[in-house]
Amino acid sequence: STPKLCLVNFMQLILFCYLTGNNDMHLKNFSLYAPKSNYMLTPAYDLLNVAIVNPKDKEELALTLNGKKSRLQKRDFVVAAQKMGIDEKAIDKMIISFNRIMPKWNSWINSSFLSDELKQKYMDLITQRMKYLMGE
């Protein structure tokens, strides 16, 4: 894996955490390993929606993004990505890709063991945050 690809994967993970309400992705949830000579981002873990079970926590991410943890907009993700050497076009593609699978997310959430109330809160959260990222 190339360093650039690892950065793209890292940015996708940040977007995923934002979209799914995972505001608990602190530094202990990210790590690197070197299977050969190059360091790589480890597979993601601890990916859960904390926002729906702890609505008093108004932070949208555990770590700051573009100097913010809440009231994030697409521009914040673009600026952060550009600082990592990822252009805006790549961020747009990531957002479009996540938007395309919204029906799958809806299906997975509806078939989960969450209560009907939490299922609705989960989908509402993802839908609202996707609108922010799509600029709506």
Residue ranges, per PLM feature:
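Anionic ligand-binding catalytic core segments
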Residues: 1-136
